[in-house]
C-alpha cells in the first residue's frame, strides 16, 4: 500500500509503508474527514485517511464563507489540510475503500478493503464519503457547473451579484431558490423548464411577483455560451433569453454504499437517504461515525469540518473510556 506522507515545510509528497492496523480509519479526505483526522492525530491516535481524491467542490475555483479561508481554492484548502494532519503522524493513502466488514463483536473492529488490493483494520471508522451532484441534463450545464452555472447563493452569490440571473426549475421547490437568489440580484428569471405553471402554488406566484422574479414557461434546450462565458438560456421554441449566471438544483446522491454494507440504519429525506446519527455523528452501527455530507445534505465546508472535529473528539474519548473500563473489569 502506498502511503502519502507530507512534510510540514513542503507540499511535495513522499511514499512509505505502514502496517495495516489502526485505531481509527477515516474514509474520505475532504474537510470533514481531514478535520476528524486532525483531532485524532493530535490526540495521539494511530489514524489512517483513505482518500479517493474526488471532492464534491472540485468544479469550483474558490470556496467562500469559511472564516480566514474565504476565496481559497478547494485544492489548496485540502493540500493544507493534508500537511496539517501529517504533522501529527496521521497516514494518508490515495485509494478507494471498496468494502468494509465488521467483526463478530465490537472489540473485533473493522476490516476495510481498498481498491489497490490491501486491507486495513481499525477499531473505529469515520465515514466521510460525502455525496455527488447529479446535474440537470441540459446541454451546457455540466460544462459550466462551478463557473457561471452554480447552485448555492451563499457559496457563489457575491461573485455574481447584480448580474442577470436565471434559475432552472426542476421541481416546484425551485421557487424557493429563485426567491433566495433575488437577494443578490434584482434581475432574476425563473425558467420553468420541466415544471408546469399549474404546479406552482398561488402563494408562491405572489411571492415571485413581489420579489420581481420573472417566470418563463417552456423547456430549456441548451445554454448559450460565447467567448467561454454564459450569455443566455435557449428554449426549445428557439427563443434565447440573455442571462449571465444560472442557478440549478442538482439532485444529491448520498454515497452510502459502505454504510449500507455495515447495516447502518438510513432514513429517507427529500434529498436522499442518509444515516440515522446522534449529535456526534455516531450511526446505528457501534463504532461507526458519519460526518459531513455523508450524514446529511447541505453541509457547507465549514459545517463539514465542524462535524469532523466533533466526531474525532468523541471517538478519542470513547476509545479512552473503553480501554479504561476493560482494565477495571479485569
Give the ranges of each region predicted by the language model.
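Residue-level detector of alpha-helix initiation sites
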Residues: 30-31, 133, 172-173, 295-296
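A conserved FAD-binding loop/helix module that cradles the flavin
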Residues: 37-38, 175-179, 291-330
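FAD-site-proximal beta/loop scaffold in flavoenzymes
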Residues: 7, 143-159, 252-302, 310
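Extreme N-terminal leader/targeting segments of oxidoreductases
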Residues: 1-22, 79, 88
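A Rossmann-like FAD-binding core segment of flavoenzymes
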Residues: 79-114, 119-122, 185-273, 320-330
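Glycine-rich dinucleotide-binding loop and its adjacent helix/turn
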Residues: 6, 132-179, 184
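Beta1-alpha1 glycine-rich phosphate/pyrophosphate-binding loop at the start
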Residues: 8, 22-76, 164, 173-198
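N-terminal glycine-rich dinucleotide-binding loop that anchors FAD/FMN and/or NAD(P) in oxidoreductases
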Residues: 42, 46, 52-54, 61-88, ...
Amino acid at each position: 500500500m502506498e502511503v502519502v506522507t507530507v512534510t510540514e515545510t513542503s507540499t511535495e509528497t513522499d511514499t512509505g509503508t505502514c502496517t495495516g492496523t489502526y485505531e481509527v480509519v477515516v474514509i474520505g479526505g475532504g474537510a470533514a474527514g481531514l478535520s476528524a483526522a486532525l483531532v485524532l492525530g493530535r490526540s495521539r491516535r494511530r489514524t489512517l485517511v483513505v482518500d479517493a481524491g474526488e471532492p464534491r467542490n472540485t468544479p469550483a475555483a474558490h470556496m467562500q464563507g469559511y472564516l480566514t479561508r474565504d476565496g481559497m481554492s478547494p485544492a489548496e484548502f485540502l493540500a493544507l489540510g493534508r500537511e496539517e494532519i501529517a504533522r501529527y503522524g496521521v497516514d494518508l493513502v490515495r485509494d478507494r475503500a471498496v468494502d468494509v466488514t465488521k467483526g463478530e463483536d465490537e472489540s473485533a473492529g473493522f476490516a476495510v478493503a481498498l481498491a489497490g488490493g490491501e486491507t486495513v483494520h481499525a477499531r473505529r471508522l469515520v465515514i466521510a464519503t460525502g455525496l455527488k451532484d447529479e446535474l440537470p441534463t441540459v446541454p451546457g450545464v455540466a460544462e459550466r457547473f462551478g463557473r457561471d452555472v452554480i447552485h448555492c447563493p451563499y457559496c457563489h452569490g457575491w461573485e455574481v451579484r447584480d448580474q442577470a440571473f436565471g434559475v432552472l426549475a426542476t421541481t416546484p421547490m425551485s421557487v424557493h431558490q429563485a426567491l433566495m437568489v433575488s437577494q443578490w440580484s434584482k434581475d432574476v428569471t425563473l425558467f420553468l423548464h420541466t415544471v408546469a405553471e399549474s404546479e406552482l402554488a398561488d402563494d408562491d406566484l405572489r411571492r415571485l411577483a413581489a420579489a420581481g422574479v420573472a417566470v418563463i414557461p417552456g423547456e430549456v434546450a441548451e445554454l448559450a455560451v460565447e467567448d467561454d462565458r454564459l450569455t443566455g438560456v435557449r428554449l426549445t421554441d428557439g427563443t434565447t433569453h440573455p442571462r449571465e449566471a444560472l442557478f440549478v438544483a442538482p439532485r444529491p446522491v448520498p454515497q452510502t454504499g459502505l454504510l449500507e454494507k455495515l447495516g447502518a440504519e438510513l432514513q429517507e429525506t427529500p434529498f436522499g437517504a442518509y444515516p440515522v446519527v446522534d449529535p456526534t455523528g455516531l450511526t446505528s452501527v457501534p463504532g461507526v461515525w458519519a460526518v459531513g455530507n455523508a450524514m446529511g445534505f447541505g453541509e457547507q465546508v465549514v459545517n463539514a469540518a465542524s462535524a469532523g472535529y466533533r466526531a474525532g473528539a468523541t471517538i478519542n474519548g470513547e476509545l479512552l473510556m473503553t480501554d479504561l473500563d476493560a482494565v477495571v473489569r479485569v
